[in-house]
Amino acid sequence: MLVVFPYQGSSIILESGNVNDYEVVYPQKVPSLPKGGVQNPQPETKYEDTMQYEFHVNGEPVVPHLEKNKGLFSEDYTETHYASDGREITTSPSVQDHCYYYGYIQNEADSSAAISACDGLKGHFKHQGETYFIEPLKLSNSEAHAIYKDENVEEEDETPKICGLTQTTWESDEPFKNTSLLIYTPEQNRYLQAKKYIEFYVAVDNRMYRHYKRNKTVIKRRVYELVNILNTIFRRLNFYIALIGLEIWSKRDKVNVQSDVKVTLKSFGKWREKKVAATQKEYNAQLLTRIDFNGNTVGLAALGALCSVKYSVAVIQDYSKRTSMVASTMAHEMGHNLGINHDRASCTSCGSNKCIMSTKRTKPAYRFSSCSVREHRRYLLRDRPQCILNKPLITDIVAPAICGNYFVEVGEECDCGSPRDCQSACCNAATCKLKHGAQCDSGECCRKCKFKKAGAKCRAVKDDCDLPERCTGRSAECPTDIFRRNGLPCQNNQGYCYNGKCPTLTNQCIAFMGPNVKVSRDSCFTLNQRGKGCGYCRMQNGAKFPCAAKDIKCGKLFCKKRNSKICNCLISPDDPNYGMVEPGTKCGDGVVCSNRKCVKLQRVY
């Protein structure tokens, strides 16, 4: 019989802050055996792949099922710090036997958990619609833990925190509601449902290093907890985040970290761009800093820039003791990178909690609103960012292969996740080998564990400018995407093919504003000759340059809703290319946009 000793406390100081109402529990580990009876022998590790605990909340038993987050670190994960003489020291530690878990509550469909088990249980879980936090009490010779709700934590600073991204929005959010009526094609559904991967790099500035008393172990544990929560949040969007590197600026900052968040973001973006150029490895990067940004701002990121060479970055103020608060900000800024705007007043689908893309932050958030999900899907279908579809290359892997992390590595034939998560009929989840008689596990050219016949269509035509791809009969993967020659007419002569797409002004307006929109009248585009406000052709070092008269439809995009006469445009102060007419767009008969100029087809194709 399980024995627990809960009691109520009035006030206590925990690692996460002052808590004025809490319950003390003594989590008991629950032995777990598969239905067959005896477990297969596993390599000796400090932390088990799966664990179960039981404790009581408000007198009711709660049993979290926890599974090690095997995809938390990439196989070529590195850690970098700097010696006292400024020398860069980079190591490739073995971090696969870690103590960071995700999971669910037994017998609860809509539940979740993100827990670290490094030194007791610390994290949060959702139980019966409420979010609870658990944390060890650090009492000598005691397994006591505190459980509390968010509203029981005394605020360090009651001022609502905000994101630094500001931009114009359409005069109503009606178009975003209408997007829910769109019906996706089978090809679009396959793309949206495909697993997506973000290779993630975290830099910690010198202020944060000094704030945590130059203790790299404490900093690493905090970052790991943050990324574990981030993973739990983004799994709902079918994204898997792999930490590929952690860099601690232990000697001095590598970028210009200022209270002006925009200056810091720009400086960090340039640093990342140089680092990517040196390593030829693409990733999304965030800078964690202890500097106090101006006003109530705690983060900033570029919108829709996840795969951008220059803008796939964000800066985050480590403003709270509570990892849940900082992780919510990290998720918010990564959401911007994934093309998601701030929520509008009508976007309420996160229960009693605030949604992640809320404009103000006073409490932790763990879910995206339905508006955010629609905007994210629209960004994916419009921009088709390729960097998120690529698993890390086997040739990049340095550390030993880990079966069960969804990454097919050296020595593996497949990897469908843990035995509990695996849904493949072709892959043995315990060994990461194909089952007897199977040729493949997944891929557009794999069906019922066999290669599809040569000539079978594996990628349908997406539009006028695309060409179908067919299986070879020798591989599970669909051949490289090919498309019609640039410059050929498309969509009833409304546009010209450009890199497999048919970019038109109308399609771009629909992509930004939803259905029932049109391109604005020509007089709106003459604003691009002003070189200020919403009208310009290019921006450099903050200065806006006007369009020549013949190039006005290659600058800012202007759209209208129904019979509106307003000249609508969309801008982002952090991405000068946001809301601009796309390259290759038809700007007249026989002419297209190239480098913000309207030029003849023959010159560019």
From Swiss-Prot:
Enzyme class at the top of the EC tree: hydrolase
Cofactor note: Binds 1 zinc ion per subunit.
Motif D/ECD-tripeptide per record, residues: 464-466
Main localization of the protein described in the UniProt heading: secreted
Pro-peptide positions on chain: 12-179
Positions of disulphide bridges: C307-C387, C347-C371, C350-C355, C403-C432, C414-C427, C416-C422, C426-C449, C440-C446, C445-C471, C458-C478, C465-C497, C490-C502, C509-C559, C524-C567, C537-C547, C554-C593, C587-C598
Pfam families reported for this sequence: ADAM_CR (PF08516), Disintegrin (PF00200), Pep_M12B_propep (PF01562), Reprolysin (PF01421)
Binding-site list for Zn(2+): H332, H336, H342
Boundaries of every Disintegrin domain copy: 400-486
EC number of the protein: 3.4.24.-
GO cellular component, one term: host extracellular space
Coiled coil: none
GO MF annotation, one: toxin activity
Tissue: Expressed by the venom gland.
Glycosylation sites: N178, N215
Residues making up the signal peptide according to the UniProt record: 1-11
Localisation per UniProt entry: Secreted
BP-aspect Gene Ontology terms: proteolysis; venom-mediated fibrinogenolysis in another organism; venom-mediated hemorrhage in another organism; venom-mediated suppression of platelet aggregation
Residue span, Peptidase M12B domain: 196-392
UniProt keywords, alphabetically: Cell adhesion impairing toxin, Disulfide bond, Fibrinogenolytic toxin, Glycoprotein, Hemostasis impairing toxin, Hydrolase, Metal-binding, Metalloprotease, Platelet aggregation inhibiting toxin, Protease, Secreted, Signal, Toxin, Zinc, Zymogen
Residues annotated as catalytic: E333
PROSITE patterns, A to Z: ADAM_MEPRO, DISINTEGRIN_1, DISINTEGRIN_2, ZINC_PROTEASE
Protein family membership: Belongs to the venom metalloproteinase (M12B) family. P-III subfamily. P-IIIa sub-subfamily.
Task of the protein: Snake venom zinc metalloproteinase that inhibits platelet aggregation and degrades fibrinogen.
Subunit: Monomer.
Name of the protein this chain belongs to: Zinc metalloproteinase-disintegrin-like BfMP
